[in-house]
Amino acid sequence: MRKKTVALVMTAALMGSICLTGCGKSTDDTSKETTTAKQAESKKDDAVSVDQEKADEVADLIDAIYVQERNDNTDKQCSDAKAAWDKLTDAQKELVEGENADPDYFGRDTGDASKDDARNQDEIGENEILVVSFGTSFNDSRVADIKGIEDALQTAYPEWSVRRAFTAQIIINHVQARDGEKIDNVEQALERSVSNGVKNLVIQPTHLMHGAEYDELMEVVENYKDKFESVKIAEPLLGEVGSDAAVINEDKKEVAEILTKEAVSEAGYDSLDAAKEDGTAFVFM
């Protein structure tokens, strides 16, 4: 009986030793590890919270300049938004999300803005051609399309100074904030014309047709007409109409033919006649 008792005691001691060794930790050690893990998780949560706060600050700055009429604070707001964006880490930039703001506002690569010319220089002279466009924040497109038109006009009329204005303040702010390129809106451009002593002003819009942007342009120009000896405003590309329905605007005809050809091709037909035979109709809206 005594041997059995001793054996049981030794077994219990051995099991206790194994438990302490196998489990490896005392209650105090486990408690400390749990506390450390919670602290690490808390620090991680705090870091995420700080990242989001910084991203939200930039989102608010972008939203403030995204859609607005130009005011005395616009220049500073644009530079502040870009400066705040530049301070973010790559991870924080991905968190930027607002009513209109997102990482693409500053982060998307749209080409080299240095290849563009804002054409907002003074020393205009007496004769000016003001090219008015809605605008685009895509740098490569702006250089190829809008600048391309402006350059062509300057080549065709070397005695006139060609300048630029955009009607979309949302585009102007975006380009200025992201690339530091300042493009005049219509009022700024007209004020520049007046201060430079322009006498003869020709306004060449790049709008395709009559619409809100063109109507707003006409309203703004009306307030400045008495400040020049002559003001001429060209029609939109597809804005001219004939004296009656029988007179067709050749520009409209050419555009309609190009659109039709492209639509037929996209639909998988070799010709418009083939589409007709198949019972397919194309509606342009």
Residue spans for each PLM region:
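Bacterial Sec-dependent N-terminal signal peptides
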Residues: 1-9
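Hydrophobic core
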Residues: 10-20
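Short, flexible helical or helix-coil boundary motifs
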Residues: 16, 65-69, 197
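Bacterial lipoprotein signal-peptidase II cleavage site
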Residues: 19-32
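Low-complexity, Pro/Thr/Ser/Glu-rich flexible segments characteristic
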Residues: 29-49
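Beta-rich interaction/scaffold domains
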Residues: 45-109
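Extended amphipathic ligand-handling, pore-lining, and cofactor/metal-binding catalytic surfaces
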Residues: 47-50, 102-285
